Amino acid sequence: MESPRGRPGPETDLLALGEQQAAIFGDGPGQTPSERPSDLRLSEDEEAENVGGASCHPKASLKTSSCSFVHPPEWEAPEDKPGRGGTFSGAGSRLGAPDPEFDLHGSSRRKDPEPPEAKPESERVCRRGSPVGGGMDVEQKEDDNEAAEAGRGGRSFSSRLQDSRSLDGLSGACGGPASSGGAESGAGGGRRATISSPLELEGTVSRHGDLTHFVANNLQLKIRLSGAPQPPPPAPTRPCSAPTPTPAIPPIDPDVLRDLERLSRELGGRVDRLLRGLGGAVQELTALSVGCIQTYRDAVDSLGEAVDMSIKGMYTLLARCEELERALQPVQGLARQVRDIRRTLEVLEALCK
C-alpha cells in the first residue's frame, strides 16, 4: 500500500489509520508482521530516534503514522549515497512510532541504540505533521537536524574515550566500518562529529590510507609558550604570630666585666706592639731595598764611565801608531843607503886583496 494518494486529512478515521499501519508493517503480500519492508532501510541513528520518539510520546504514534508513504526506488539505498542519507529521517518517511505490538516484533532486528537527548516541546509538536503538503519538507529538515544532533551525542562519549589514544589508534578507529557507516548516514550531507574532532580543534588532520597526519596550528607559538619561564609562585604570607616572650636575662657578675675589660686592654696593647714591630720591619726592608737600588745605580754609572775611558784610550793608541808610522818613513831611506854603502865596502875589500 503505497502513498501516491498523498497524506490523509485530519478527518481520517482512526480505524482506517490502524488498517493502513497493519498493511504497511505486516499485512502486505509475502510479509509477516515481524518483518520490516525491504524497501525501507533505516540507519542506526534513525532507529535510535524512532525508539526515543516512541518512548517520549506513544500517544502521538497514530498521528505521526498518518503521513507514512513509500519513497521512490532511488531512495532505497542511503548507504550507497551518503549525501542522501537524511531523506528517510522525516516524521512520515520513518513510519512514525509503531504500536507496541509492532515494536515487539521488530525489536529483535534492531540494535540497542543510545537514548537520544530530551527534545523540547516545540520539536514534539512540529514532528506530528500538518495537513499541508509543504509541511513534510520542513519536518524532514528538522528531523535531519535532530538525526545529526543524535549522532553527535552518540559519539561524544566515545570521542572522549579515544582522545588519549595515539594517532595510529585514531586512524584505525576512524577508518573502521562504524565510522564510515556513521558518515554515510549523516544528515543532509552535512559534516558529522568524528572520533578525531579533538585533534581537528588543535590542527589539521589528513588521512592517507591507514596513516593519519596531524599538523598543529601555531606550532611556533606553542613551542615558545612551553619554553617560557614560569613566574615564581608568590611567597606565602605568614600570619601574624604572637610575639614570643623574651627569655629572662640572668644578672651579670661585675667581676666578669672587669676581667673582660682587662683582657681587652691587654689584647689591644699586644696588637699595638705587633703593629709597631711590623712597621719597623717594613721600614728596614724599605731602607735595604733603597740601598740596593742606589748601589746598583752607582755600579752601572761607574761601569759606563770605565767603558767610555777604554774606548777613548783605544782611539788614542791608534792615533799614536799612525804618527809613529809616519815618523819611521825616513828611517827606511836611511836603511837603503846603509845597505848601499855596505855593498860598496865589500867591493873595495875584494879589490884590495
From Swiss-Prot:
Residues 229-253 have a biased composition (Pro residues). Keywords: Lysosome, Membrane, Phosphoprotein. It is found in: Lysosome membrane. Residues 172-191 have a biased composition (Gly residues). Residues 23-194, 225-253 are annotated as: Disordered. GO terms for biological process: lysosome localization. Residues 102-126 have a biased composition (Basic and acidic residues). It holds the Pfam family BORCS6. The modification Phosphothreonine is found at T194. The modification Phosphoserine is found at S130, S166, S197. One of its GO terms (cellular component) is BORC complex. As part of the BORC complex may play a role in lysosomes movement and localization at the cell periphery. Associated with the cytosolic face of lysosomes, the BORC complex may recruit ARL8B and couple lysosomes to microtubule plus-end-directed kinesin motor. Component of the BLOC-one-related complex (BORC) which is composed of BLOC1S1, BLOC1S2, BORCS5, BORCS6, BORCS7, BORCS8, KXD1 and SNAPIN. PANTHER family: BLOC-1 RELATED COMPLEX SUBUNIT 6, BLOC-1-RELATED COMPLEX SUBUNIT 6. Belongs to the BORCS6 family. This is BLOC-1-related complex subunit 6. The lineage of its organism: Eukaryota, Metazoa, Chordata, Craniata, Vertebrata.
